[in-house]
Regions:
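Generic secondary-structure boundary/loop-capping signal
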Residues: 51, 107-109, 115, 199, ...
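Metal-dependent nucleotidyltransferase catalytic core
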Residues: 1-8, 16-27, 35-92
Length: 277
């Protein structure tokens, strides 16, 4: 904080992220997400003298200085700093128009306010991170995409295309599965608890049986195990989707489920040299 207090160009500093969340579990690896409001960006743009001020750097990343994705150069610069002592600081500098978006985050704690411009910010809370109930359209789209991609996975296994299979299953199919898991979690918690980034807090509220089945969807590279994980994925998705549909009065697309499930089982039983389906 002395760095910010002694720099007249820095007008305010806030803390975001898990350290601003009273409900987040505390541990030794929590990052410090710090954002600084500045009047002039030029002193903080690609400045190699800034990171060493906070400790001995193990590895440094500057997102706005990376080739991909291309930087927008829009009045924002970030230093992601992992220190050798185990601490990490994500330090950003923002011009006023971009700092507005930073302080709109419900997880915001004021650390410094030289001009009294942040006095109306409410106490930090995780309300922005609560799951939201699905619309029927979102629900139907999720079901459709899950079963659509599941067929891709099955065809990829038959073709012996490991990298394609793992990507389709662990990125696209899992994305839809986790949407459904979060909606189910929301129902169980009345949509008043946050599932955490990537669902990291789901385990504490899911039935142990469901969590055990979810673990089984993470397979190794052996195709027999990938098949099994795909079937378990389908079982969990179907079970939770029917619960979600029942809770909100939606119609579960059973016909799509049946069509794709039967197709997947048929592919599994196809000989490797099959000339027709």
């Amino acid at each position: 904080m002395n760095y910010a207090r002694n720099d007249d160009n820095i007008r305010a500093v806030v803390l975001n992220g898990s350290r601003a969340n009273l409900n987040a579990p505390k541990d030794i690896f929590q990052d410090y997400d710090i954002a600084c409001l500045v009047n002039d960006m030029s002193p903080y743009f690609k400045n190699p003298n800034i990171p060493p001020l906070f400790g001995e750097i193990m590895i440094l990343q500057e997102p706005e200085d990376m080739q991909e994705p291309p930087a927008e150069n829009d009045g924002h610069y970030t230093y992601l700093m992992q220190f050798k002592d185990g601490n990490r600081i994500d330090l950003s500098f923002d011009l006023p128009e971009l700092f507005k978006a930073v302080i709109e985050d419900s997880l915001t704690v004021i650390l410094l306010d030289k001009d009294g411009i942040l006095k109306d910010i409410p106490p930090s809370s995780d309300k922005d991170y609560m799951p939201k109930p699905p619309t029927e359209k979102l629900f139907q789209d999720c079901c459709n995409e899950f079963w659509w991609v599941s067929a891709y996975v099955a065809k990829g296994i038959w073709r012996n295309e490991l990298t394609f299979v793992k990507h389709m299953q662990d990125v696209y199919a899992r994305e839809q599965l986790m949407k459904m898991v979060v909606w189910y979690f929301g129902i169980k918690t009345d949509f008043k608890e946050a599932p955490g980034k990537m669902g990291k807090y789901l385990k504490k509220q899911l039935d142990p049986e469901i969590w055990t089945e979810l673990e089984k969807t993470y397979s190794d590279a052996k195709f027999e195990n990938v098949w099994e994980s795909l079937f378990v994925m389908g079982d969990i998705f179907r079970r939770l989707a029917k619960d979600v549909a029942s809770n909100f009065g939606f119609q579960y697309p059973q016909q799509e489920d049946d069509n794709v499930s039967n197709f997947i089982y048929k592919i599994k039983n196809l000989p490797a040299d099959a000339k027709e389906i």
